[in-house]
Amino acid sequence: MAARLCCQLDPSRDVLCLRPVGAESRGRPLSGPLGTLSSPSPSAVPADHGAHLSLRGLPVCAFSSAGPCALRFTSARCMETTVNAHQSLPKVLHKRTLGLPAMSTTDLEAYFKDCVFKDWEELGEEIRLMIFVLGGCRHKLVCAPAPCNFFTSA
């Protein structure tokens, strides 16, 4: 269940969050491989995440204040999420993501280091905002905004 998302860098937490495309944005657009993306400031994301959006194709967790559960990651080399720093990102994605083939945790870690983090380090922040993982999660699609607990097992 993949959805088109835009990147939102939260410098206060050093977290790159992904939001459904169509959210109100005052950020300048960035050209990415899937079209124009936007990089809204944290305050540009409305409090009622998604109430004004077209909901077709979006999982329930797209409206969580933490962002989509499988598509939230940091720029830290240890690849820890800020929500649950005891689990590495590859392990979370391995459990929750449908968009990638089944891989071991080691393979996933190598995949993200090669495809994402290496480019972040070499190309800098401007390019980093355009590099993201477009996968999916196991949450059901919704017809109306609904809360989603980030910690709920999929």
UniProtKB/Swiss-Prot annotation:
Pfam families: X. It comes from the Viruses. Keywords: Activation of host NF-kappa-B by virus, Activator, Apoptosis, Host cytoplasm, Host G2/M cell cycle arrest by virus, Host mitochondrion, Host nucleus, Host-virus interaction, Modulation of host cell cycle by virus, Transcription, Transcription regulation. GO terms for cellular component: host cell mitochondrion; host cell nucleus. Residues 68-117 are annotated as: Mitochondrial targeting sequence. InterPro entries: Transactivation_prot_X. A fraction may be phosphorylated in insect cells and HepG2 cells, a human hepatoblastoma cell line. Phosphorylated in vitro by host protein kinase C or mitogen-activated protein kinase. N-acetylated in insect cells. Its main location: host cell. GO terms for biological process: DNA-templated transcription; symbiont-mediated activation of host NF-kappaB cascade; symbiont-mediated arrest of host cell cycle during G2/M transition; viral genome replication. It is found in: Host cytoplasm; Host nucleus; Host mitochondrion. Multifunctional protein that plays a role in silencing host antiviral defenses and promoting viral transcription. Does not seem to be essential for HBV infection. May be directly involved in development of cirrhosis and liver cancer (hepatocellular carcinoma). Most of cytosolic activities involve modulation of cytosolic calcium. The effect on apoptosis is controversial depending on the cell types in which the studies have been conducted. May induce apoptosis by localizing in mitochondria and causing loss of mitochondrial membrane potential. HAMAP family: HBV_X. May form homodimer. May interact with host CEBPA, CFLAR, CREB1, DDB1, E4F1, HBXIP, HSPD1/HSP60, NFKBIA, POLR2E and SMAD4. Interacts with host SMC5-SMC6 complex and induces its degradation. Interacts with host TRPC4AP; leading to prevent ubiquitination of TRPC4AP. Interacts with host PLSCR1; this interaction promotes ubiquitination and degradation of HBx and impairs HBx-mediated cell proliferation. Belongs to the orthohepadnavirus protein X family. This is Protein X. The gene is X.
